């Protein structure tokens, strides 16, 4: 543990670790060989200074090396966010994932139970009847038969148990809040990736590029949502074959009305499951609008739509045809088989 103490002294001094040093430090953290006091001091020092891109790359590499992997079809994507926007919005990315899968794109959704909201992806899917915590072979079957799977973070990142008590004791978010969304167990290389802090957007996009992602839209709503919002514009950093570009999405430009944050607010898992089901049954609402907007982005990132407007139209069609409702029904059936 002398090496970890050296890394701890480095970050405590305000200096940054190299990519290799960060990988070694997080290997130690995730192995359970670091004391709680050392772990807390290390995570606090990183948070106070702000994590460098090399430190994040090293940390993600350590996470990915320990995760339980899932085999996914070529071209599978994820729609995921860092969380932590404290908006209380309903499960936008979960519904967007269902709509995207209903349009023929494999979605390997990675998520967890609620951290700062009342209902995380895992919570609402359980309320809808989906069995979570499945082994990799069952998840591969979900992808094959339903076009969609849900990879429960606690199942795939067991090493996180070593730092969970320390994270619970710290009254602020740490680097681990961004590591989960960057560590998809299916190894997808295309993502719609929401961030709750605008300062994270470009660095984390570059991190994904360094780690092999091919096509990414990193999004942050003007209202703070870690989604493409319908209350106003959303800033997007797009990664395409190693190059980054910046643009803004206005929902009105793809035929969707503006909403308020109150319109998008959710509740507990049962409330959100009922709202999601209503959208799949054809209900017109702000919930539907933001879901088709984010699904449209997923289709563009997957290469299944040439423009956002085309993607939104396809997502609308998946609801109206009943394909999205059928996709969820298949996921429920296959996950419980």
UniProtKB/Swiss-Prot annotation:
This is Anthranilate phosphoribosyltransferase. Homodimer. Anthranilate 1 binds at residues 81, 112. The keyword Metal-binding applies. Its cofactor is Mg(2+). Keywords: Amino-acid biosynthesis, Aromatic amino acid biosynthesis, Glycosyltransferase, Magnesium, Metal-binding, Transferase, Tryptophan biosynthesis. It catalyses: N-(5-phospho-beta-D-ribosyl)anthranilate + diphosphate = 5-phospho-alpha-D-ribose 1-diphosphate + anthranilate. NCBIfam families: trpD.
């Amino acid at each position: 543990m002398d090496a970890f103490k050296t890394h701890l002294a480095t970050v405590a001094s305000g200096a940054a670790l190299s990519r290799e040093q960060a990988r070694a430090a997080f290997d130690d953290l995730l192995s359970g060989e670091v004391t709680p006091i050392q772990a807390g001091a290390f995570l606090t020092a990183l948070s106070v200074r702000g994590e460098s891109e090399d430190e994040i790359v090293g940390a993600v590499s350590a996470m990915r090396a320990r995760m339980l992997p899932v085999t996914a079809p070529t071209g599978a994507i994820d729609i995921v966010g860092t969380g932590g926007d404290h908006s209380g919005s309903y499960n936008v990315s979960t519904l967007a994932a269902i709509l995207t899968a209903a349009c023929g794109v494999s979605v390997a959704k990675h998520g967890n139970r609620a951290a700062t909201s009342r209902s995380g992806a895992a919570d609402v899917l359980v309320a809808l009847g989906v069995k979570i915590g499945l082994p990799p072979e069952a998840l591969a079957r979900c992808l094959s038969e339903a076009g969609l799977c849900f990879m429960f973070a606690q199942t795939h990142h067991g090493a996180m148990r070593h730092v969970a008590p320390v994270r619970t004791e710290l009254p602020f978010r740490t680097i681990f809040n961004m590591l989960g969304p960057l560590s998809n167990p299916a190894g997808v290389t295309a993502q719609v990736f929401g961030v709750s802090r605008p300062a994270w957007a470009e660095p984390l996009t570059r991190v994904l590029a360094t780690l092999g992602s091919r096509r990414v839209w990193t999004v942050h709503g003007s209202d703070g949502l870690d989604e493409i919002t319908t209350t106003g514009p959303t800033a997007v950093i797009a990664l395409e074959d190693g190059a980054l570009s910046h643009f803004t999405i206005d929902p009105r430009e793809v035929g969707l009305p503006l909403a308020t944050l109150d319109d998008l607010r959710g509740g507990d898992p049962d409330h959100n499951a009922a709202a999601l089901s209503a959208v799949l049954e054809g209900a017109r609402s702000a919930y539907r609008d933001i879901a088709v907007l984010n699904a449209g982005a997923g289709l563009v990132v997957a290469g299944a739509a040439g423009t956002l407007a085309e993607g939104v139209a396809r997502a609308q069609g998946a609801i109206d045809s009943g394909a999205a409702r059928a996709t969820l029904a298949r996921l429920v059936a296959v996950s419980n088989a």
